[in-house]
Amino acid sequence: MKGIILAGGSGTRLYPLTRAASKQLMPVYDKPMIYYPLSTLMLAGIKDILIISTPQDLPRFKELLQDGSEFGIKLSYAEQPSPDGLAQAFIIGEEFIGDDHVALILGDNIYYGPGLSRMLQKAASKESGATVFGYQVKDPERFGVVEFDNDRNAISIEEKPEHPKSHYAVTGLYFYDNSVVDIAKNIKPSPRGELEITDVNKAYLDRGDLSVEVMERGFAWLDTGTHESLLEAAQYIETVQRMQNLQVANLEEIAYRMGYITADQVRELAQPLKKNEYGQYLLRLIGEA
């Protein structure tokens, strides 16, 4: 399976911060925002990842993450000249996807919770169909909303409905089989002129091929698209790291624990940083601090 991070958009909700840098390069406590969705794909066992962003921002992502080899992964990059909808990612990434299945994650979404890696790897291992994730919210009219029957089977999905049929939002993380490329090519732009991811999910639902996994109590899904939610996410990450004495979205740690890099490689990455807490954390990880 391959992965795509959609890190485009104009960032108008975070203006004027986004005059200085892409939204997905903003700090969320102690790491760039892009680290969080990248860590999610790595935890799913995905090592071949395409980052899609605007022509003006893409060089900054390349400078930050380069080819991904220091984390034992392969990173590629592609331009999205204009924000024409989330489903456009599969058209832009068609050649990258090839004959593989693909996961898409939005560049401003953060996930954290017990058993997250197992849940992600289960979704990534499915042979066919699509898997998305439902999360209970107080303001479902802001999201794509999924309706369930009494057996927790998805029966409808609506994009930002005026009268939501449930409080379960579809989060910004999606796993698809290879037919997603053809589906994306054949959906029509919505009234706002975008290729909606909800229409992709509806296509899978109509053919009986959509699985919705509910993120239960204990999971956190953070959408960092506003000033308030960006601050809340930073405070959440700080609290988790301080209370649990661990790092969230530490790419070197995840790469090591997933077997993508060795202890020697971690040591090499940590040495230039050994005078700060980040480097000390990496050295403790391999038992050398």
From Swiss-Prot:
Transmembrane helix is among the record's keywords: no
Record Pfam families: NTP_transferase
Superkingdom of origin organism: Bacteria
SUPFAM superfamilies given in the database record: Nucleotide-diphospho-sugar transferases (SSF53448)
Gene Ontology molecular function: glucose-1-phosphate thymidylyltransferase activity; metal ion binding
Requisite cofactors: Mg(2+)
Enzyme Commission (EC) number: 2.7.7.24
Biological processes, Gene Ontology terms: capsule polysaccharide biosynthetic process; dTDP-rhamnose biosynthetic process
Similarity-based family: Belongs to the glucose-1-phosphate thymidylyltransferase family.
Name of this chain's protein: Glucose-1-phosphate thymidylyltransferase
Lineage: Bacteria, Bacillati, Bacillota, Bacilli, Lactobacillales
